[in-house]
Amino acid sequence: MENNSHNVDERRAARMRGAERYKIQNVEFSLDQNLLANLESSTSSSTRSSPASNQQNLEIVSQSEAYHKISDLDDSTSIFSISDQENILERRISEEVVRENSVSSIENVSSSAVARETQSSANILVKDNHFFSHKQKKIQRESIPFHKRDNIETSDAYSSSILENSPPNKVQRLSSLDSSQDSFQEEHPGNVTGTTFSSQAPEERIASPISTSSPESLTNQSSSLQSSLQTSSMAPRNLLDQSTEKDIVVGASDELVRIELTKLSKEAGGSKTLNELDAVQQFFQEFIKENEPLEPYVVKVKNAFVEQVSIRLLELIDLLDANRILSTACKKAANEKLAVQRDLSKLREDRLSVQRKKIQLRNEYIKLSHQQNFLDDIDDFFSQCETVKNELENVTTTPNSTEAFSEINEYASALSKNYGLESQLVELQSLLTQFYQKFLS
């Protein structure tokens, strides 16, 4: 038992040392104090709108907060490089400018321009998701034919109209964005159509703020949404399903995960025993490690979650090890109990045999006691004979000879009747009578 408990402690210490290797990152972070206030303001403004506009306003707030958070991150706390941060900032600025200008010019821009705007914004989203990059060229070749020069001209005209209606600071941002796009087109001339236009339109449009929107703008916006949905219906069904599935957050209880465990061979370093809990723990830790989040506090929360789950799994494994040790000890005790029961049955059989021998010895003792009594009686008889003989030798007269002879005769007859020595005693009596007759003559 002591060796088993020692092995359990060693295994627990080894697992605790190995659990530290599955931590994702050691990130120190501090929450923004205005985060709760922004969330409360966004939720209070969204309560006065419909569910669709509610969700759109929450997306606006979350995107603006992500923009400010990314701009405030320094090199020590950021998980991106400087070039990645600049690319993210450019994309966020372009999305914000297109969103704000689409709200101001939604009454003047035609439905075709809105559809092209939805296509350009969808292209930015598809560019962020590398998962759809290999399918985009196939869609452009097969489903949606378009001319390269005309689309570039219409996009230039649309961007010039946006520059005219934009404030100075936004014009500066747009000019920097255009310069970055021109440099990208010079470096990658073959990907101009792929980066400017897309065959897929997003299913959700960000609505304008509730305080600045009018009923007419809302109606125009609903018509633009319908047109964008019509254009997006031209895309293949599987691509739309994949984009929607990527945005949906599925809970832990909404789907089942099937894990198949394979046991390694002896040549590959495998053993006969396979611990399922260790494999499940390693699977979840590697899954969380591969899906690294963008926010540092999510990394911190996942690290704490992995640590707590690892500790609980280690405790469960320790309990299973202790249960295994106790079960083996119980089996050993049961086997020992059976052996003791067999020994006890043998002892009982020996006891019965001793009792039988004791009874036999008692019977033999009774027989020997009877024989001893018989021998004692014979000794008494011979002693009496000796006394009679001595008396007969010393007697000179015969007044009492008849009395002595009669006593001996009576004693001999009694002895022969009691012990079955009648023939021997009869012979002895005849000898005595002959001796007595000779003595008298």
Swiss-Prot record:
Cell division as a keyword?
Answer: yes
- Predominantly, its location class is nucleus
Ranges annotated as biased composition (Polar residues): 160-173, 192-201
Q: Where is this region: Disordered?
A: 160-240
Job of this protein: Component of the kinetochore, a multiprotein complex that assembles on centromeric DNA and attaches chromosomes to spindle microtubules, mediating chromosome segregation and sister chromatid segregation during meiosis and mitosis. Component of the inner kinetochore COMA complex, which connects centromere-associated proteins and the outer kinetochore. COMA interacts with other inner kinetochore proteins to form the inner kinetochore constitutive centromere-associated network (CCAN), which serves as a structural platform for outer kinetochore assembly.
User: Subunit notes for this chain?
Assistant: Component of the heterotetrameric kinetochore subcomplex COMA, which consists of fta2, fta7, mal2 and mis17. The COMA subcomplex is part of a larger constitutive centromere-associated network (CCAN) (also known as central kinetochore Sim4 complex in fission yeast), which is composed of at least cnl2, cnp3, cnp20, fta1, fta2, fta3, fta4, fta6, fta7, mal2, mhf1, mhf2, mis6, mis15, mis17, sim4 and wip1. Interacts with mis6 and mis15.
Report the protein name in the record.
Inner kinetochore subunit mis17
What organism is this sequence from? Schizosaccharomyces pombe (strain 972 / ATCC 24843) (Fission yeast)
